[in-house]
């Protein structure tokens, strides 16, 4: 991957992080605490945790995100390359067995969305990639090789799109003429499959979401990451999870309700204030759930 000219500073690293004040309240960072940012991304949340005095272990599978964090020279930040689903082993390799807090900001980060070349956005022309890392199959591999029935299942399950079969059929017909290689190609195919679309939310949004979730196994990673949090958090440690759609939020909610060692801090998810939503439209769908690691008393 070719990196841009090195103009990175601690200030330029920040992206627009959602629910920043709420995350700080949930994790309560103070000097001496060790906190894991399992989804480092643009390091917006990490910067705030560092300013509060915590030592942060930032995990990301995106090498570009890690390079930017290293170049920023943020003190008390240790970066680790990998998926947060593997954070137990990643931290063990760094000599850490327990932590005071864990943050998971699920999905694609703002700076990944804004990087046209990554293929996450249907608004700009780019190779149809969508991989957080550079390993595994890309979104182009999926749309060009999967059976229509399997494509429909992915779009329905992960995109919750009622027209999944119609979209899969349109993809199948289009790829018979030529491979689908770019984001705009796919977006136009999906748009044509929607009857009477004129304006509003682009009909490709759900399909792109579904492909991204599938390509990166995001829901599987979330389940593994939640289990890892139970292992890593010391008693009194806090977990904060930000999700952006109902699939993720349901997984987090059910996991916390079923956990014997994680006690939810709020009955309902925390959402962005009206002021934040006006400033940062991406925060409108964000939901924060937080929990505290408790000690389970063994029955006598």
Swiss-Prot record:
Enzyme Commission code(s) on record: 2.1.1.199
Keywords for the protein's UniProt record, in alphabetical order: Cytoplasm, Methyltransferase, rRNA processing, S-adenosyl-L-methionine, Transferase
Location in or out of the cell: Cytoplasm
Main location, first listed in the record: cytoplasm
Amino acids binding S-adenosyl-L-methionine: 43-45, 60, 105, 112
InterPro entries: RsmH (IPR002903), SAM-dep_MeTrfase_MraW_recog (IPR023397), SAM-dependent_MTases_sf (IPR029063)
One term of GO molecular function: rRNA (cytosine-N4-)-methyltransferase activity
GO biological process annotation, one example: rRNA base methylation
Enzyme class name: transferase
Similarity field: Belongs to the methyltransferase superfamily. RsmH family.
Function: Specifically methylates the N4 position of cytidine in position 1402 (C1402) of 16S rRNA.
UniProt name for this protein: Ribosomal RNA small subunit methyltransferase H
